[in-house]
């Protein structure tokens, strides 16, 4: 099973110009019940849309409903950052602190035995989480 990183969800957005054919093809052959999100990904989508609304209001407004649509599409397949995930998250910061949201997503994937699907493999490599880069595969 897989946890999709924010960059994968963004790449799969309907109407995204110049979307990666490799990523879309990879996602198309996966059973939807094998694809999950971290709740942190929904946070990142919401933050991204809000930032875009400030920087480019027309584009941001056009995407305002998108994070909610992603949440509906993944209903029942969104994993929380839970009490049991927190200790694993803490260990990912020793000896080298990591970006909190990336470490939270990695800890969630590791707790469930899932692979992290991302383009940003460098951000996750040292965590020990299983990785898949659909841009490169």
Go through the PLM ranges and name each one:
Residues 1, 106, 110-137:
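Acidic, PIN/NYN-like endoribonuclease modules and their adjacent C-terminal/linker elements
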Residues 1-37, 41, 51-69, 137:
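Short, well-structured N-terminal submotif of metal-dependent ribonuclease cores
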Residues 5, 44, 102, 120-123:
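Acidic active-site catalytic centers that drive phospho-/nucleotidyl reactions
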Residues 9, 42-45, 86, 124:
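A generic structural signal for short hydrophobic patches within well-formed alpha-helices
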Residues 11-12, 48, 88-92, 127, ...:
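Residues that scaffold the ATP/ADP-binding catalytic core of kinase and kinase-like folds
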Residues 36, 79, 132:
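General small-molecule cofactor/ligand-binding pocket signal
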Residues 39-40, 82, 120, 135:
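Residues at the C-termini of beta-strands that transition into short coil/loop
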Residues 47-53, 61-64, 72-119:
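Active-site neighborhoods of divalent-metal-dependent phosphate/nucleic-acid chemistry enzymes
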